[in-house]
From Swiss-Prot:
Main location per the UniProt record: cytoplasm
Gene: mnmE
Cofactor: K(+)
Listed name of the protein: tRNA modification GTPase MnmE
HAMAP family: GTPase_MnmE
Binding site for Mg(2+): 238, 259
Keywords: Cytoplasm, GTP-binding, Hydrolase, Magnesium, Metal-binding, Nucleotide-binding, Potassium, tRNA processing
Family: Belongs to the TRAFAC class TrmE-Era-EngA-EngB-Septin-like GTPase superfamily. TrmE GTPase family.
Cofactor remark from the record: Binds 1 potassium ion per subunit.
Subcellular location: Cytoplasm
Positions with a binding annotation for GTP: 234-239, 253-259, 278-281
Primary role: Exhibits a very high intrinsic GTPase hydrolysis rate. Involved in the addition of a carboxymethylaminomethyl (cmnm) group at the wobble position (U34) of certain tRNAs, forming tRNA-cmnm(5)s(2)U34.
Amino acid sequence: MTEFDTIAAISTPMGEGAIAIVRLSGDQAVEIADRLFRSPSGKRLKDVPSHTIHYGHIIDPKSGRVVEEVMVSVMRAPKTFTREDVVEINCHGGFVSVNRVLQLVLANGARLAEPGEFTKRAFLNGRIDLSQAEAVIDLIRAKTDRAMNVALQQMEGRLSKLIRELRQTILETLAHVEVNIDYPEYDDVEEMTPRLLREKAEYVRGQIEKLLSTAAQGKILREGLATVIIGRPNVGKSSLLNALAHENRAIVTDIPGTTRDVIEEYVNVRGVPLRLIDTAGIRETEDVVERIGVERSQQMLKRADLILLVLNYHEPLTEEDERLFAMIEGMDAIVIVNKTDLPRRIDMERVKELAAGRPVVGTSLLHEQGIDELEKAIADLFFGGELEAGDLTYVSNSRHIALLEQAKTAIEDALAGIDAGMPVDLVQIDLRRAWELLGEIIGDTVHESLIDQLFAQFCLGK
């Protein structure tokens, strides 16, 4: 285990609440807490068993004044998250109380932790690997149950296990090649022929491709579908956002141009996280503020994963509607014909023709009709029910996806070398590159600056 100084931070969100926690980790964690803690029985934290919790007060050692009433948990190395001694001081929530406790802890020998430093220590001390550490932040940021389950899988080491198995296969192959080259006289070692080498390389490539086949869905679960709502002014775009978000997030009026900017909201649609973006109605306008909103709407379209195009059932199609269809040509989209509670004036056959095979859903958002059908269309368009398979290991992290793609390329370079009749000792260069790239996923072969960058994304106290 690596030796570090003792760190401390508030590990609960700031603000009013029932309980706040100050966490300490390091060799001096128990000693520092012991200087500040007084129990009614006079017991000392240094003498208590590991994984126990104790009632008492935090005392300012200089003045002897009672600062807080607390419950203190003591957990001794190595059976802790960081594999160091860990103390958690549970005090009352709020801003003043928890900060008083933290300042006393820092004044008595602890250092304020950097973002993600507790998890970083868990990684550096061998408690978790890098992909498991990254899953911690995914778990915290998960917007749906499914996204949380994917993060939990990664935290449990399912991806790590597969990566280690692939690296072991490559390593055994490399070792076999080395023995053949360095000790050709060993008759009891099977010769690594091009055919045998190809079998090993094709197996690794197949497993990498299997992982990459989950990447599109995994990335959606991790980051959410960037879903842009577009349509002419006053067709019900903001009503759609409110209906999917199940709250009044956007202003809804009968005045065209009410939404003058881009409104974003995360929503959960049947387990699929949507980063729902309500745009200003796209139309020609003289209003400077509204025109800026329209320009931003057009920019958002270029970055969207899904377009929800809203039309008015009670009005004929306009040139603006047809122009919107042209703008989203070739994109994943669902056409929503809203206000079906009113008499039909829209040409539905023309709508279906313009939709070009993409789903068309009728809604009356005023009366909350058609929302279930819309949610089903969204889930079916991207997942088609396949997400329920619990035995899949999803790859959701962009860094992991990029490294898997690079490793696959290295394996394919090795296969091309075999086909070209290159010597086995040259082919192994590409295999070793694949082994190193896979190692970067779990942190076995990764630069320290990248580790610092990854953990800097965490919140304080985690």
